[in-house]
Regions:
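Fe(II)/2-oxoglutarate oxygenase catalytic core
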Residues: 1-157
Protein backbone atom coordinates (compact mmCIF):
# COMPACT_ATOMS: atom_id res chain seq x y z
CA UNK A 1 0.00 0.00 0.00
CA UNK A 2 1.33 3.41 -0.95
CA UNK A 3 0.08 6.14 1.35
CA UNK A 4 -0.29 9.63 -0.06
CA UNK A 5 -0.89 11.09 3.42
CA UNK A 6 1.43 10.20 6.28
CA UNK A 7 -0.58 12.26 8.75
CA UNK A 8 -3.85 14.18 9.09
CA UNK A 9 -4.19 17.45 11.00
CA UNK A 10 -7.04 19.07 12.88
CA UNK A 11 -6.34 22.58 14.08
CA UNK A 12 -7.99 23.78 17.31
CA UNK A 13 -10.34 20.79 17.33
CA UNK A 14 -10.90 20.70 21.09
CA UNK A 15 -11.72 23.62 23.37
CA UNK A 16 -9.06 24.82 25.81
CA UNK A 17 -11.32 24.06 28.79
CA UNK A 18 -11.50 20.40 27.71
CA UNK A 19 -7.73 20.31 27.14
CA UNK A 20 -7.22 21.63 30.67
CA UNK A 21 -9.59 18.96 32.03
CA UNK A 22 -7.56 16.22 30.29
CA UNK A 23 -4.30 17.65 31.66
CA UNK A 24 -5.89 17.68 35.12
CA UNK A 25 -6.56 13.93 34.91
CA UNK A 26 -2.83 13.30 35.03
CA UNK A 27 -1.92 15.64 37.87
CA UNK A 28 -0.15 13.83 40.70
CA UNK A 29 -0.29 10.54 38.75
CA UNK A 30 2.58 10.94 36.28
CA UNK A 31 5.47 8.47 36.39
CA UNK A 32 8.78 8.49 34.53
CA UNK A 33 8.19 6.95 31.11
CA UNK A 34 9.88 3.68 30.28
CA UNK A 35 10.61 2.04 26.96
CA UNK A 36 9.85 -1.51 25.90
CA UNK A 37 12.16 -3.84 24.06
CA UNK A 38 11.01 -7.01 22.27
CA UNK A 39 10.85 -10.20 24.28
CA UNK A 40 11.85 -13.28 22.30
CA UNK A 41 9.82 -15.75 24.32
CA UNK A 42 6.22 -16.20 25.39
CA UNK A 43 5.40 -15.10 28.91
CA UNK A 44 4.19 -17.57 31.50
CA UNK A 45 0.69 -17.12 32.91
CA UNK A 46 2.27 -15.93 36.16
CA UNK A 47 4.39 -13.30 34.37
CA UNK A 48 1.40 -12.05 32.38
CA UNK A 49 -0.90 -11.86 35.41
CA UNK A 50 1.72 -10.03 37.49
CA UNK A 51 1.59 -7.03 35.18
CA UNK A 52 5.38 -6.76 35.39
CA UNK A 53 6.98 -6.65 31.97
CA UNK A 54 10.48 -8.04 31.56
CA UNK A 55 12.88 -5.95 29.49
CA UNK A 56 11.21 -2.65 30.33
CA UNK A 57 13.20 0.25 31.64
CA UNK A 58 14.14 3.89 31.51
CA UNK A 59 16.63 4.91 28.82
CA UNK A 60 17.09 8.68 28.74
CA UNK A 61 19.08 8.45 25.50
CA UNK A 62 15.78 7.49 23.86
CA UNK A 63 13.05 9.09 25.95
CA UNK A 64 12.67 11.72 28.65
CA UNK A 65 9.03 12.23 29.59
CA UNK A 66 6.40 11.35 32.17
CA UNK A 67 3.26 9.33 31.44
CA UNK A 68 0.00 8.25 32.97
CA UNK A 69 -2.48 5.85 31.38
CA UNK A 70 -6.14 6.79 31.42
CA UNK A 71 -9.25 4.79 30.71
CA UNK A 72 -11.85 7.50 30.31
CA UNK A 73 -14.96 6.65 28.28
CA UNK A 74 -15.78 10.32 27.67
CA UNK A 75 -12.30 10.90 26.26
CA UNK A 76 -12.66 7.93 23.92
CA UNK A 77 -16.04 9.30 22.78
CA UNK A 78 -14.43 12.70 22.20
CA UNK A 79 -11.56 11.52 19.98
CA UNK A 80 -13.08 8.48 18.23
CA UNK A 81 -15.02 10.57 15.63
CA UNK A 82 -11.77 12.40 14.73
CA UNK A 83 -9.94 9.11 14.29
CA UNK A 84 -12.67 7.66 12.06
CA UNK A 85 -12.93 10.83 9.97
CA UNK A 86 -9.15 11.13 9.50
CA UNK A 87 -8.98 7.46 8.51
CA UNK A 88 -11.38 8.13 5.64
CA UNK A 89 -10.31 11.65 4.59
CA UNK A 90 -6.60 10.80 4.57
CA UNK A 91 -7.37 7.82 2.34
CA UNK A 92 -6.06 5.17 4.74
CA UNK A 93 -9.38 3.32 5.10
CA UNK A 94 -8.04 0.92 7.72
CA UNK A 95 -10.40 -1.49 9.45
CA UNK A 96 -10.36 0.12 12.90
CA UNK A 97 -12.60 -1.13 15.68
CA UNK A 98 -11.38 0.15 19.02
CA UNK A 99 -8.69 2.03 20.91
CA UNK A 100 -6.12 1.29 23.56
CA UNK A 101 -6.13 3.12 26.88
CA UNK A 102 -5.22 6.77 26.49
CA UNK A 103 -1.63 7.67 27.31
CA UNK A 104 -1.15 11.17 28.66
CA UNK A 105 2.46 12.25 28.23
CA UNK A 106 4.13 15.25 29.81
CA UNK A 107 7.30 16.66 28.30
CA UNK A 108 9.16 19.10 30.50
CA UNK A 109 11.77 21.47 29.07
CA UNK A 110 14.42 19.32 27.36
CA UNK A 111 12.16 16.26 27.20
CA UNK A 112 11.82 14.17 24.07
CA UNK A 113 11.05 10.77 22.60
CA UNK A 114 13.26 9.80 19.68
CA UNK A 115 11.73 8.42 16.50
CA UNK A 116 9.95 5.14 17.22
CA UNK A 117 7.18 2.91 15.99
CA UNK A 118 4.05 2.87 18.12
CA UNK A 119 2.67 -0.48 19.19
CA UNK A 120 4.23 -3.85 19.80
CA UNK A 121 3.91 -7.22 18.13
CA UNK A 122 5.67 -9.46 20.64
CA UNK A 123 4.22 -11.43 23.54
CA UNK A 124 3.92 -8.26 25.67
CA UNK A 125 1.64 -6.50 23.21
CA UNK A 126 -1.71 -5.48 24.64
CA UNK A 127 -3.18 -6.93 21.44
CA UNK A 128 -1.94 -10.40 22.43
CA UNK A 129 -3.47 -10.28 25.92
CA UNK A 130 -6.83 -12.13 26.04
CA UNK A 131 -8.01 -9.90 28.90
CA UNK A 132 -8.10 -6.94 26.47
CA UNK A 133 -11.33 -8.11 24.91
CA UNK A 134 -11.78 -5.11 22.58
CA UNK A 135 -8.34 -5.29 20.96
CA UNK A 136 -7.14 -8.89 21.42
CA UNK A 137 -6.06 -10.35 18.09
CA UNK A 138 -5.78 -7.00 16.32
CA UNK A 139 -2.87 -4.63 15.67
CA UNK A 140 -2.52 -0.89 16.12
CA UNK A 141 -3.02 0.84 12.79
CA UNK A 142 -3.28 4.51 13.73
CA UNK A 143 -1.88 6.67 16.50
CA UNK A 144 -3.44 9.95 17.58
CA UNK A 145 -1.45 12.78 19.10
CA UNK A 146 -3.59 15.38 20.79
CA UNK A 147 -1.52 18.43 21.73
CA UNK A 148 -3.16 19.93 24.80
CA UNK A 149 -1.02 22.98 25.49
CA UNK A 150 -0.64 26.29 23.71
CA UNK A 151 2.04 26.58 21.02
CA UNK A 152 3.99 29.20 22.98
CA UNK A 153 4.33 26.70 25.85
CA UNK A 154 5.91 24.07 23.60
CA UNK A 155 4.10 21.15 22.07
CA UNK A 156 5.98 20.65 18.82
CA UNK A 157 5.43 17.25 17.25
Amino acid sequence: MVLTNQWYLYSAAIEKLVCDKIIGLGKEKFKKASIDVPVSRDLSAEERSSGIKPNVGVDESIRISDVVFLNEDWLFELVWPFIKEANVHAGWNYDIRSCESQQLTRYKKGGYYKWHTDGRSDSLSAYNDPSNVHINGYVRKLSLSLLLNDNFEGGEL
